[in-house]
Amino acid sequence: MADEIKTGAYICKGCGLGERLDCDQLATIAEREGKANIVQQHDFLCNAEGVAMIQSDIDNEGVNKVVIAACSRRSKNEAFNFENVAISRANLREGVIWVRPDDDESRETTQEMAADYVRMGCSEVKYMNLPNVNEEASSNDNLLVVGGGVAGMTAALEAAKAGYPVTIVEKSGQLGGSAAFEYKRIPEKAPYADPEDTGVAGMVSEIEANDRITVHLNSTTTKTSGAPGRFSADISTESGSTTTGNFGAIIMASGARNYDASQLPELGYGKSPDVVDQAGLEKLAMEANGGPIKRPSDGKEVGKVVFVQCAGQRSDKEGHLPYCSGHCCLTSVKQAMYFKDQNPQIDTNIIYSDMRTPGAGGEDFYRSGQMKGVTFTKGTVSEVSAGGNGLTVNFKDLILDQDVSDSADLVVLATGQIPNSGVDIDLPVTAEEDEAQAEDQVTETAAPEVKVESILNLTYRQGPDLPHLKYGFNDSHFICFPYETRRTGIYSAGPVRRPMDMAQAKEDATGAALKAIQALENAKLGRAAHPRSGDLSFPLFRKEGCTQCKRCTVECPFGAIDEDEERYPQFNEARCRRCGTCMLSLIHI
């Protein structure tokens, strides 16, 4: 019978298991107590011979439930990747012998512990069912990329090369993002000696020529609903027209904006037109187009330029950015080369507190700047003032430990990036206060208006945008889980995820595209989007036991649970990551 359950239990003797455990006794327990139909032992279950033994039982004996008593379920997933069977892993290596003393006194307890793991594995596999294919999402291979900058374009091109249709939504009237307004970029290829062309024009041409990529300019996503494999997004234009598209996964590459340098009056911004930020210098360089860069105030050629690093960032002062934006130091080196490459006699001085050169070739590019005559001064700038025929920069030289003044025709502030990450759903609009005090305040003054702008406009129970990490970046974890957000099937790439330069944004976008493809392919197969531990199943909800307390809808960290019209939990299995938070919050699930 096709529906007949036939369990096979396989016990490994490798990695010291055979020496530490009585595998014959474990086999007997699997057969008698675990009711396994087939029980076999092998010296090295994960090698080709052991895998072939299991596959033979699946093909010839009809085994459809497999218990592997060996190592952790996080190990050897490729070896034990059997199709169309339920697999339970009894962790005898990491969970038993590696955590138990290897002595005669502990041997009996170790054996009992291993026996319990075998019992649990046999019991678990009985109730495991293969995930069902989601027919609704089976044909949805489309990817939505929100943002048409370097990260967004790279993600779209990489996904299109893999054969997936892509839709780009860009709020401005052209592709390229901030990179479209840069004269040159930090080099991406050896010998990392000179600034390179941004390559934006080539990427735009490649996208326009690719029939798998659709571009919506002057557009935003005004509504996003659904789950991996079956997202639905309303794309609205400035004219008011709206189209609805269906997508398997979403990449959020909304980029970053420049810090508002007008908050730095002590550094002269807004007081003198000759004090600009890095974006302002890029504009001057593009206007010069390889010729002499001229200062905005009177159009004279710049003879001396000072770059002020960490302007308004890496600071605990109110209104400043507390973090490093990653690209600013090398961007200043690049911009100093604009002057040196045009005229080596121009005096270029970069005042820094700490010079940071991340990424491949960053140190080489920094040394190239030194070779071209760029001056680097370790110091902290206190004031930039205009007077006479130029600017005066007052700073403390941290090497000489004394206050110094320097003159300049032009001052460039390295002001940093702020992620375009939308509404932070984890932050309340107003401060939490005692109810009585709040009522008094309402009668006296109106609540302050908080202007927010959503990027995705999600219809999730938990809010319209992605939860943020520290400082507004919306990754789940920079190192352990890159690209992943707390909204399954939605991945972030580029400077909205963490501070980075153009080369890093391209690499980032490629990774996000691969993760998005993985999510939609798993959704087509009815699998969870994050099968790291080999578990492809989902929790089951008993509606008859629900008291409508809403704890599960609120506490799910991934927004997997909404509410239906009757106010019962509406479980979106494709959003679930099987963390078990809902099961802990409600024991009757």
What are these regions (language model features)?
Residues 2-587:
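Residues forming the flavin
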